Amino acid sequence: EKRVQHVLDEVELHSVSQQTIETLSKGFKRRVGLAQAIMHDPKVLILDEPTDGLDPNQKHHVRELIKNLARDKIVIISTHILEEVTAVCSRAIIISQGKIVADGTPAELEARSKYHQAVSVRLSEAYDLASDLSGLVDVGGVEQDSEDDRVFRILASDGNSIFSQVSEVAQAKHWPVTEFHVSRGQLEDVFRTVTQQTQGAE
């Protein structure tokens, strides 16, 4: 009885504890699943796609629950939702064709992305900013958004910081900037790269 009450507290189910499962929302059903999984206080918890199909509020609640559980348990998550990895994980492993092809913290994997340290720029009007950047050796290239020609990603060579250099050029050339920010990198980009390399090697 004491353990049941503790689990209800931990997964925040007291408000619906007298309802049958079929009357619960998807988010609460997911919490019931978590409650069942931790009832016997396992040291290791393995969760498969824990927020799949949930709305943003439900995702937030389940992710907070997972973080709380991870304080005294090893929690392993299998997911294809890469935002989940940055939201709750301290270590990320990418598996392709049954082999580990990447292993590190989310930040370490993001640093392997071609978009690590890239500067994203949105302009108020069309402008050829690539020609203004041709003299910067740390700029590895410029990508223009295929759907909006006012949006650019300025890529950094070898992950070097280029924000201050690009900012100076933008001010000197009077770019019509409305947004300007640096990317940490994209896990999706790293996932595609390492899994395609594995598939191409076979």
What are these regions (language model features)?
Residues E1-S96, V101-A102:
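ABC transporter nucleotide-binding domains
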Residues L8, A35, E110, F191-R192:
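Conserved protein kinase catalytic domain
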Residues L13, L24, A102, E125, ...:
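Residue-level signature of the cytosolic catalytic core of signaling kinases
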Residues T23, D148-D149, G185:
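Positions that flank functional sites
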Residues R31, V62-R63, A130, F163, ...:
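A general structural signal for well-ordered alpha-helical segments in protein cores
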Residues H60, D138-E143, P176-H181:
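A short linear hydrophobic-aromatic micro-motif
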Residues R63-S157:
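ABC transporter nucleotide-binding domain
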Residues S157-E202:
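C-terminal coupling/interaction segments
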